[in-house]
Amino acid sequence: MFRRLIIFISAIMVESVTVGADTYVCPQLLSDSVAQTVATGDTIIQKESLWKRVSDKLGARYFNSKYDSAYVMRPEGKGLTLKVRMNQTGNTFHAKGTVNGIYSKTDLSTSHKTTFSLAASYRGIGAAIAINPAKWSGVYKDYELNLNYYGRRFSLDLSYQRSESLSGDIYGDRGDKRLESGEATLKVLNLVGYYTFNHRRFSYPAAFTQSYIQRRSAGSWLLGISYQGGSIKTNDELKQRSPDAPEITIEFGHIGLGGGYGYNLVLGSKWLLHASILPTVVVYNRNKMIVNGENKEAQRMRFNMIFNERLAVVYNFSQRFFAGATLVMNNSVFDDKNVVINQNKWRARAFIGVRF
């Protein structure tokens, strides 16, 4: 599939892939309403609120978590965390190679997205409301959704990106060309799930949701699965500028399996430094390419990998107040004897918060 893509690049187009960060999903944070009472004659029927049932289940899981208290502690309070965050995301794409005797080199990127958000986390589940000034002003028209769950044993990252801002330079034997924003539409879904083996002493939530506090340094091996899929399609703007450019649709999907390692380094009693990497080897490919309405056979790459990296710095002023920054990166490498393709998606975040 990507060999066909390079052919297309040399004509005037190319694609980018993946991913990155920000919102959590949870039940709406309502007050702890106890029960609704309904009178029917002499009968009193008590209807327990849905939120209380959910809250009780979350509380049982949160307060009864089996962390080693010498390494990980639960802050005092009800398990509610509020944060103010600034987020920025970006996506770059690089490709070079020779296909059918035609050499090309491509450097593309989507527009950076900067948002400000207010986030709430309740006993491990959270939600965030983000504001994007550039989108309000009409400068940024891309769409991006990020869902994250960080648990004691299992964690999950999901991101979806729809971008029309892909732009950059294409160099090759046929001359240098420019892909302008709006000439192609990229849609990409990324999903990463991973299991933490040393889940009693190593805490992802301590680094990324701050719902726990790492007291002593600890690391853990990780087992993970990743999925990357989506499509790239040329737009009418490209045809208007280059009437001879082909109409191309590329659909792709990759599933990878792998393992990695994460480490939480505690400095003093207030600083936490986190680093982790989870490489996965692609074990399944589903690629499809349509050129001017005709299906083309997609070729497999000989070496496919998807890397997932995370960094975090957290400073706990006390059990209640904290601040920090995180960086999440997703990198893809696709390689055969003629073509090398590399994609990098990243999300940076700075935050300050309080625990209740």
Locate predicted features.
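Extracellular/periplasm-exposed beta-strand and loop segments of Gram-negative cell-envelope proteins
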Residues: 105-117, 167-171, 177-189, 230-254, ...
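Outer-membrane pore/translocation modules
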Residues: 71, 76, 146-251
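Repeated loop/turn-to-beta-strand initiation elements of outer-membrane beta-barrel proteins
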Residues: 124-130, 153-157, 199-202, 271, ...
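Outer-membrane beta-barrel "beta-signal"
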Residues: 190-193, 344-356
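Cleavable N-terminal export/targeting peptides
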Residues: 1-73
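Transmembrane beta-barrel strands of outer-membrane/channel proteins
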Residues: 82-90, 120, 129-133, 149, ...
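Residue-level signature of outer-membrane beta-barrel architecture
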Residues: 120-122, 131, 149-151, 195-197, ...
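Surface-exposed strand-loop-strand hairpins of Gram-negative outer-membrane beta-barrel proteins
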Residues: 90-115, 126-137
